Amino acid sequence: MTVKRMDNVGIVVEDIDAAIEFFTELGLDLEGRAPVEGDWADGVTGLRDMRVEIAMMRTPDGHGRLELSRFLTPPAVADHRNAPVNALGYLRVMFAVDDIDETLERLFKRGAQLVGEVVQYKRRVSALLHPRA
């Protein structure tokens, strides 16, 4: 078996509209929105009577996608938003941008916060945005 590509990364959100606005402001495109439910969805996730609203966001180059999910039933359970960066599990998604300062300025207006600081690393500027953003 050969992996063809990474299809998407899933993020569970409380407010799907706010998440769409945030990632649109970052530069991703909304590919589509849809409800997800039924026996097939229950089977894939292992959750009974699952109902989720999803939005698929695509990077401008078309090579990466984020699946934003808002659980209607069962409700979302664990809250990892304040977990430290060394906690187990999914904690970050990184994007390459043309202008880090301009991008951060736009995202700060949407409530984003830096976890640390903007630093220079191998001729690339990197920053961590707080996951509550």
PLM feature spans:
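Conserved active-site tyrosine of GNAT-family acetyltransferases
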Residues: A19-E25, M57, L107
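C-terminal "cap" of GNAT-fold acetyltransferases
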Residues: T2-M6, V36-L66
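A generic structural signal for short beta-strands and their flanking turns/coil linkers
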Residues: L26, E53, G64, G89-L91
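Short, low-complexity disordered segments enriched in Ser/Pro/Gly and basic
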Residues: D49-M50, V85-A87
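N-terminal beta-strand motif that seeds the catalytic metal site of vicinal oxygen chelate
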Residues: M1-I20, D29-G32, G89-V97
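Vicinal oxygen chelate
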Residues: T2, I11, R33-P35, M56, ...
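A short, acidic/glycine-rich surface segment
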Residues: G38-G43, P75-R81, V125
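Acetyl-CoA-dependent GNAT
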Residues: R70-P74
